[in-house]
A protein has these predicted regions:
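Acidic, Mg2+-coordinating active-site environments of NTP-dependent enzymes
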Residues: 1-2, 110, 119-191
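Short, basic phosphate-binding NTP loop
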Residues: 1-33, 43-55, 189
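Residue-level signal for inorganic ion chemistry
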Residues: 17, 34, 61, 85, ...
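Flexible beta-alpha connector loops of hexameric P-loop NTPases
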Residues: 71-82, 130-137
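Hydrophobic anchor at the start of a short beta-strand
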Residues: 58, 99-100, 178
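Conserved nucleotide-sensing/catalytic segment adjacent to the nucleotide-binding pocket
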Residues: 77-105
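Short beta-strand-centered segment that lines the nucleotide-binding/catalytic pocket of NTP-utilizing
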Residues: 55-69, 104
Length: 191
């Protein structure tokens, strides 16, 4: 006995099935995404440390590994496929993790690997010339990264954007309520 699902967009069908299977829409976990060409791994490590020091139980999905208390595995991809993402968020929730920090690559955004993930917030580090074999040009690359911020499912979202980066300043125009940060612009502030 085999069930077959027909859908015009197989990637959408996959993440919807993953979300339904692992009920990631109702988890008791705050998910934060970090995107940018450079600095995602460093940012997730810093966030993990700060949140742990603040008393949170933290999980991290990123370039080096996927880890949470009692679990660590080498990461074959910066951002895994939807089945793995949703499964791991459910596993973290079952282990009492209350904050998950995730590196979100442009490939993952474009390929719908993080669709259905209940992001509570996101951070943008920078955008430099990379992955143009995939995105064709910087404008397409930027628009893909911006989707993480513009398509966040929660109304109350926390956004942090590097205002020292020219693409970050452009993202701030699209997300005026975001917290801006940077060395050149002074202390973090809302625009």
């Amino acid at each position: 006995d085999c069930r077959v699902v027909y859908h015009d967009d197989p990637r959408e069908a996959l993440w919807r099935l993953a979300e339904a299977r692992w009920r990631t829409d109702v988890l008791n976990i705050t998910v934060l995404g970090v995107t940018g060409t450079n600095g995602k791994t460093t940012s997730t490590y810093l966030l993990e440390r700060l949140l742990t020091e603040a008393g949170h139980k933290v999980g991290v999905l990123g370039t080096v590994n996927y880890r949470w208390p009692g679990h660590c595995e080498t990461a074959p991809l910066t951002t895994p496929d939807p089945l793995k993402v949703h499964s791991m968020l459910a596993q973290m929730d079952a282990k009492g993790v209350d904050v998950a920090v995730m590196e979100v690559s442009s490939h993952a955004i474009d390929q719908q690997r993080v669709c259905g993930v209940p992001f509570a917030g996101a951070a943008f580090t920078n955008l430099t010339q990379d992955h143009l074999d995939f995105h064709n040009d910087m404008e397409s690359y930027f628009k893909t990264k911006a989707r993480l911020f513009l398509e966040l499912p929660r109304a109350e979202k926390a956004l942090a954007v590097n205002a020292d980066d020219p693409w970050g300043r452009r993202l701030l125009e699209l997300c005026p309520r975001a917290l801006s940060f940077g060395l050149q612009q002074g202390p973090p502030r809302r625009r």
